[in-house]
Amino acid sequence: MNSHQNQTGVQKKGITEKIMEKLPGHHGPTNTGVVHHEKKGMTEKVMEQLPGHHGATGTGGVHHEKKGMTEKVMEQLPGHHGSHQTGTNTTYGTTNTGGVHHEKKSVTEKVMEKLPGHHGSHQTGTNTAYGTNTNVVHHEKKGIAEKIKEQLPGHHGTHKTGTTTSYGNTGVVHHENKSTMDKIKEKLPGGHH
């Protein structure tokens, strides 16, 4: 490739080789029986985190590596199991039976619910990939504004409906308050969804 030798006869890498090593899927040089001390820059540390990049492979040698700030931070992140992680964290066929899901809403979600025409989140059976959730009960916490609205004259209380949905899940119960718009839509001809 673009290898050059300096005055002492030590091979130096050309810019093309340096760039090629940084590209995902490049398998770097192979060293045998070599003691290798390496201090990595920010780019190398980031590139090592990408899937498909395997860096230098040493057989029979000792490889000492000084970890930088990026690697230390990456190891502290949840789900990161060090720099030699193998396999994936994907679960298939997971079955969650009899679980209770309590949802605490963010400020944005609370504000969005107060806006006219917004009917809240209708999410059921989350956090399971390619599996089945059975008997999941979904509770929503009432906010201060909802409690005040119940105390106002003319408010007829909450009408909680227990609906069993079958979107690939069995026995999922989602309790929700009907909005005024939903009640009006039900009264209109053809408004039964």
Swiss-Prot record:
Residues 86-99, 160-171 have a biased composition (Low complexity). Induction: By low temperature and also less strongly, by water stress or abscisic acid (ABA). GO terms for cellular component: cytosol; membrane. GO terms for molecular function: cobalt ion binding; copper ion binding; nickel cation binding; zinc ion binding. Residues 78-100, 153-193 are annotated as: Disordered. Residues 173-193 have a biased composition (Basic and acidic residues). Expressed in desiccated pollen grains or seeds, roots, stems, trichomes and the vascular tissues of leaves, and in all tissues of young seedlings. This is Dehydrin Xero 2.
